[in-house]
Amino acid sequence: MIQMQSMLDVADNSGARSVMCIKVLGGSHRRYAGVGDIIKVSIKEAIPRGKVKKGDVYNAVVVRTRKGVRRQDGSLIRFDRNAAVLLNNQHQPIGTRIFGPVTRELRNDKFMKIVSLAPEVL
């Protein structure tokens, strides 16, 4: 459950380390984002010589949340940290590698590129 001012880890090799959610996209009064939702983020920490720099604003898709994802069979998949993958304006990932597991729900949300790059799909 991600809202404005939430801090997230970055799960790709774009050069960003942590980002802050500045807007949840998809509706004028939408408050929360979950796994598979697109948010607007600001880069708060970045490595030198990365593809992005501190202060830049990007779209991102949420790939892991502490709140978790409820499955149809009643199981709940939750993670230790909130994480996102940075996207360009065409909603394609900026990085070429994905770190850590992602959930199968991303497959339904047209993020097959992220699912195929991820080392593990839960």
From Swiss-Prot:
Binds to 23S rRNA. Forms part of two intersubunit bridges in the 70S ribosome. It comes from Tolumonas auensis (strain DSM 9187 / NBRC 110442 / TA 4). GO terms for biological process: translation. Transmembrane segments: none annotated. GO terms for cellular component: cytosolic large ribosomal subunit. Disulfide bonds: none annotated. Pfam families: Ribosomal_L14 (PF00238). It comes from the Bacteria. GO terms for molecular function: large ribosomal subunit rRNA binding; structural constituent of ribosome. The keyword Ribosomal protein applies. The keyword RNA-binding applies. PANTHER family: 50S/60S RIBOSOMAL PROTEIN L14/L23 (PTHR11761), LARGE RIBOSOMAL SUBUNIT PROTEIN UL14M (PTHR11761:SF3). Belongs to the universal ribosomal protein uL14 family. Keywords: Ribonucleoprotein, Ribosomal protein, RNA-binding, rRNA-binding. Part of the 50S ribosomal subunit. Forms a cluster with proteins L3 and L19. In the 70S ribosome, L14 and L19 interact and together make contacts with the 16S rRNA in bridges B5 and B8. This is Large ribosomal subunit protein uL14. InterPro entries: Ribosomal_uL14 (IPR000218), Ribosomal_uL14_bac-type (IPR005745), Ribosomal_uL14_CS (IPR019972), Ribosomal_uL14_sf (IPR036853).
